[in-house]
Amino acid sequence: MSKQSSIEQDGKILEALSNAMFRVELSNGHQVIAHISGKMRMNYIKILPGDKVRMEMSPYDLTKGRIVFRYK
């Protein structure tokens, strides 16, 4: 069986939660909970409320995601 591809969406950080989790508002208005990817953690990339980010989401659970990029 092949692995399903993830859905990429852009969003804006609304608030920082505990354990490197964030509440993100997507461009279509939905709010999801997202965590930082491992590469961003290793490179100490800081994310603050108001930042624009790119997220990956599983097609099976659209309420959770992984932040993979922070726009400048």
Swiss-Prot record:
Keyword Disulfide bond: no
Domain S1-like per the UniProt entry, residue ranges: 1-72
GO cellular component: cytosol
Source superkingdom: Bacteria
Pfam families xref list: eIF-1a
Subcellular location: Cytoplasm
S-S pairs: none
An example molecular function term from Gene Ontology annotations: translation initiation factor activity
SMART domains: S1
CDD domains assigned to the protein according to its UniProt record, in alphabetical order: S1_IF1
Keywords linked to the UniProt accession: Cytoplasm, Initiation factor, Protein biosynthesis, RNA-binding, rRNA-binding
UniProt entry tagged with the keyword rRNA-binding: yes
HAMAP family found in the cross-reference section: IF_1
NCBIfam families: infA
Function: One of the essential components for the initiation of protein synthesis. Stabilizes the binding of IF-2 and IF-3 on the 30S subunit to which N-formylmethionyl-tRNA(fMet) subsequently binds. Helps modulate mRNA selection, yielding the 30S pre-initiation complex (PIC). Upon addition of the 50S ribosomal subunit IF-1, IF-2 and IF-3 are released leaving the mature 70S translation initiation complex.
Subunit structure, as described in the record: Component of the 30S ribosomal translation pre-initiation complex which assembles on the 30S ribosome in the order IF-2 and IF-3, IF-1 and N-formylmethionyl-tRNA(fMet); mRNA recruitment can occur at any time during PIC assembly.
Protein name as annotated: Translation initiation factor IF-1
Source species of the chain: Cytophaga hutchinsonii (strain ATCC 33406 / DSM 1761 / CIP 103989 / NBRC 15051 / NCIMB 9469 / D465)
Record lineage: Bacteria, Pseudomonadati, Bacteroidota, Cytophagia, Cytophagales
Gene: infA
